[in-house]
From Swiss-Prot:
Sequence ranges of Polar residues compositional bias: 171-185
Region (Disordered): 107-186
One GO-annotated biological process of the protein: regulation of cell septum assembly
Key words, A-Z: Cell cycle, Cell division, Septation
Keyword Flavoprotein assigned: no
Compositionally skewed regions (Low complexity) per UniProt: 128-137
Name of the molecule in the record: Probable septum site-determining protein MinC
């Protein structure tokens, strides 16, 4: 056997990344838009790999300035989709052209919700391994509401246009579907401001309050049996069939498969502080009341 071949090997890999879609080539406008998006999203997208999609702009992009703007927000670019002169400019700036494909949503499944431990283990960022509950914060201000949410959507849907250019994509064609866990991650303690929990390859169930400033993230569905006052993201790896369920909706930010809404104003009375679900309808985020 050739011992030199043991030093390394080549394997196929699937990489999930943020797709930053440019609608303008003006550096000032791009930086302002990026600043606002990141301020709205908090730490959701920090340190996530980025693929820049410049196919919608004809004007030349200032690639060094754009790359610096992304770096300032801890968004490392790993590739580009562009055409003609912009493609060459991106190459000159050190970007690698990539092909994008859309991930297939997983089929709905019955989740065994037997809890592991009450407290999840730390994780660096959204798409990394294991579950996370990080950072200390101030006191909680309410008790958890244990009322179960009925998953059948009722009336009073609120249609929300896409706010972000995050589309979870694949830089390479996948060779296998990521494994789905047989049980959901269950958290039975309220989450305080500054805490984050991430359920990898499964659903997340929080029995208690998610305070303002806390974040709950899952590759599958997010269930909050209590007031949801922080940020919630379902389908973190691009599962467009994922949903968010809560018995009391009062969130700062809602996201499914990267399509998100910052809740700057109070929701409709039929939704605010009521049982609700959040789902994707094409590229539109819908918030719907749940009837008991």
């Amino acid at each position: 056997m050739n011992t030199e071949s043991l030093a390394l090997d080549f394997k196929s890999a699937t990489l999930y990344a943020i797709r930053v879609v440019l609608h303008d080539a003006d550096t000032t406008r791009l930086r302002a838009a990026l600043d606002k998006r990141m301020a709205d999203a908090g730490s959701f997208f920090e340190n996530e790999p980025v693929v820049i999609d410049a196919t919608r702009v004809d004007a030349p992009v200032d690639w060094p300035a754009l790359l610096q703007a992304l770096a300032d927000h801890n968004l490392p670019p790993i590739g580009v989709v562009a055409e003609d002169a912009n493609l060459q400019g991106a190459r000159d700036a050190g970007l690698v052209p990539v092909e994008l494909s859309t991930p297939v949503a997983r089929a709905p499944q019955v989740i065994d919700t037997a809890p592991p431990n009450d407290v999840a283990t730390p994780v660096p960022s959204v798409p990394e391994a294991t579950a996370e509950a990080a950072a200390k914060a101030g006191p909680q201000d309410d008790e958890a509401d244990g009322e179960q949410a009925d998953e059948a959507p009722a009336h009073n849907p609120e249609s929300v246009p896409t706010r972000a250019a995050r589309e979870t994509t694949e830089a390479n064609r996948p060779t296998a579907t990521p494994p789905q866990s047989s049980s959901a991650l269950v958290i039975t303690k309220p989450l305080r401001s500054g805490q984050r929990v991430y359920a990898r390859h499964t659903d997340l169930i929080v029995i208690g309050m998610v305070s303002q400033g806390a974040e709950v993230i899952a590759d599958g569905n997010v269930h909050v049996y209590g007031p949801l006052r922080g940020k919630a993201m379902a389908g973190a790896r691009g599962d467009t069939s994922a949903r968010i369920f809560t018995t009391q909706l009062d969130a700062e930010l809602l996201a499914v498969a990267g399509v998100y809404r910052v809740v700057e104003d109070k929701l409709d009375r039929a939704l605010h502080n009521q049982p609700a679900l959040v789902r994707l309808d094409g590229d539109t985020l819908r918030i719907e009341a749940l009837k008991g």
